[in-house]
Swiss-Prot record:
This is Interleukin-5. The keyword Glycoprotein applies. One of its GO terms (biological process) is positive regulation of DNA-templated transcription. GO terms for molecular function: cytokine activity; growth factor activity; interleukin-5 receptor binding. Keywords: Cytokine, Disulfide bond, Glycoprotein, Growth factor, Secreted, Signal. PANTHER family: INTERLEUKIN-5. Homodimer; disulfide-linked. Interacts with IL5RA. Interacts with CSF2RB. It comes from Felis catus (Cat).
Length: 134
């Protein structure tokens, strides 16, 4: 019996470790994009004279359109080349993913109970994951 318990715990630990090691394709894309951004930061800054509107709000989820407008401005003012092509391609893929996710915001009509359940989860996310400003 004790051996069975040890084997079960060992299997559970192995499953946990393998679940941590597996990242979603979007997580890998974002990680790669962050690395590319860090690598090419100096090239993107250039002479430092380009002015791009930057949101003041700390809740990045609320400023997605402004962020991607800034990316478009940066892309249009950056000399094309192999060095930054992958970065802008990745950013484009991230935007496409976000746009697909936003299409899921429109939903069917359901009874009020289902909406209230959704609202409760939504408020929980705001309470725990968003930076609250005064």
């Amino acid at each position: 019996m004790r051996m069975l318990l040890h084997l079960s715990l060992l299997a559970l630990g192995a499953a946990y470790v393998s679940a941590i090691a597996v990242q979603s394709p979007m997580n890998r894309l974002v990680a790669e994009t962050l690395a590319l951004l860090s690598t090419h930061r100096t090239l993107l800054i250039g002479d430092g004279n380009l002015m791009i509107p930057t949101p003041e709000h700390n809740n990045h989820q609320l400023c997605i359109e402004e962020v991607f407008q800034g990316i478009d401005t940066l892309k249009n003012r950056t000399v094309p080349g192999d060095a930054v092509e992958k970065l802008f391609r990745n950013l484009s893929l991230i935007k496409e993913h976000i746009d697909r996710q936003k299409k899921k915001c429109g939903g069917e009509r359901w009874r009020v109970k289902k909406f209230l359940d959704y609202l409760q989860v939504f408020l929980g996310v705001i309470n725990t994951e968003w930076t609250m400003e005064s």
